[in-house]
């Protein structure tokens, strides 16, 4: 007889190798055929809603690692919620207006100046839809389950119509106004920018100290002094109309040789060192408030520079006397307005100085720095010129420096509802908790929101102007424009004359001749995406406002979190979200930002083509995503190793359940042995820990718990112990069925627990699970813990055993290294445990050979009675010797019972019995 044929070895068709790059697309086709999204929604219908609202990625180019991290995190949450009692719809979105699409077309050779705005916008829309399609397929490849056939896209007519309504509601409440104010201006884009559209990069700038002679000292100064200002933007000096000082600061009149200078007293030493003053002497001090209304002379123009008081003046740098140009700075503008200064801005849309800057007209602002500095030197006003590298705002699209420039723009008044915004921030749950402080401070400190842009591709600002110049925004015009957009799309604004966009028969007192013109500016794209709570959450029947969660990168505190909050609070008085979760950025393995120049860009598509989507998803679950995260080939190799461990665990479980029918072979919990019940307790611990971790969005805890369970609890302990019984005993042996009962519970629970993270693998496992009836594991619920009587005592006892087992394994390893034994099954061990361990060992003595995987086990006295040569460990002394007897051909155990059964001379007594009872007819 071939005894190897009597062993019940694992048997399954579940493949050992994942081959995910090939298998996953096939699984996704299967999901598409069965309409998995609709199936899950149908299955969870009627449950409480959980809405995670998708922040729309920008529709331009392939998805990058930041996109992958974001979408996969969202997918974890949505999948978990749909398996824990919620209906969790997920509607993906795309942000489709804005400058990058205009630039992409220009780069492709589109001659926009040779076509109408409407024609150019049609090309923009076509391009945007192509990009949506491209990204949609890439997101689907990640295994993200979503309503891919019905996304929201910001260029769609229904969306634009709702955005117009949001604008109209804000205007109705008096929150929208037109005014001339300094705004972030990008000369390269020729447009205003919002705070969310700027990024800071290092820039080299001139750093100059300039003297402004006093013209009128107002009886506080003698008139022969000079104010010293410091600036890194010499090009703004032609626009200087004043000098700001702090009312509470003390200012010093400093005599240096024959000159007298005015600076803040506490900056005396710093300025003296910078300007290399020798023998400088403070001859007088005055309070800043006393200097108000003194007058200085502009260094190279024949005009006054008024000295004003400003709370914005600090002593962090400079001189305490601040160059003030109301057309080129927010603080300057506010102070200048208070003192009645004009808003002088001698720079045009392209960043070129105009004839209001005599002597420098026609120069690009940055190129004007040198001639202006030379002019200052010529007139004796330049005290110091150096160059510094400092953090400076840049256009996030063109990556070029931006300027502050006063222009006529449309604004949303944040001041009008700032209190409500701050209350909404306080009522929201923030993860991480510092998010609340971050957004609170942004809302507290931000100025009014400049919402107009001087571009073509976007949603028009729905304002008309009467003949007398009055802007017209009424319920009637807003509703009419919204209806037109819903029917024809926003291109209609550029295809029709103003009169054809107004309601029929519309009249206005400011237009006696019935003539009107329309606004040509478009809305900031942050107003587009920031209106999604109205256009998507409120409008779609399967969603609700407020959403339960917004989840985006940490850059969105100043972006989508902020713009959505602003429009929602303005329109509804409440935040559009109950909770906000943010994640960090994806860096390379060395913690560097990814960039083409370094050549360290990791592309999701490449990972999926080489390793598979589930490996990428497992990586997402492994990182502390609330901070910046790292990815590299080495990191992915480690993750792939963990994946292999999990997959092999599934394969082992399936292989050993091939002959198990849960409805017929399950053993009642009360009838299981202690070790089996202990394993159920460990499984319960895993279920609780993993579900709690999912609930708190701690996916790294899920990853580590599952990995540790597979490697430590299963592979290194229970499965190792179980093999002897599973393979050697007869199919229906009570101990074997007991172990299979536990393995079955583990298999079902583990498959469900990994489903949110590894959906492809979980759905690959599911059809092999005995008794699985559902078409997909996604249509099941998360596992519940099994009631195990006396679980606390059981856990305490067996956790203690596991520490003792570690001692025994160490002793066996030493014996192996010293060539006392070959493998552990060659060993005979005698234990001399501590007193408390002894009683525990006696209570489970019949299982100990299998638990230690040795051929012979003896219990000696206590640790104090152990032979002196016996190695002592924390809980026991261990004597390891070669087991006596011969090796059984079937089970490999060394036994003195080999050959006792004459019919089976090479088998031990146990194997001979099993063979006779199960295989001999």
Curated annotation (Swiss-Prot):
Protein name: Isoleucine--tRNA ligase
Compartment(s) where it occurs, according to its Swiss-Prot or TrEMBL record: Cytoplasm
Residue positions binding Zn(2+): 888, 891, 908, 911
Organism in which the protein naturally occurs: Bacillus mycoides (strain KBAB4)
Domain of life: Bacteria
Record bears the keyword ATP-binding: yes
GO BP term (any one): isoleucyl-tRNA aminoacylation
Subunit record text: Monomer.
PANTHER family: ISOLEUCINE--TRNA LIGASE, MITOCHONDRIAL, SOLEUCYL-TRNA SYNTHETASE
Keyword field: Aminoacyl-tRNA synthetase, ATP-binding, Cytoplasm, Ligase, Metal-binding, Nucleotide-binding, Protein biosynthesis, Zinc
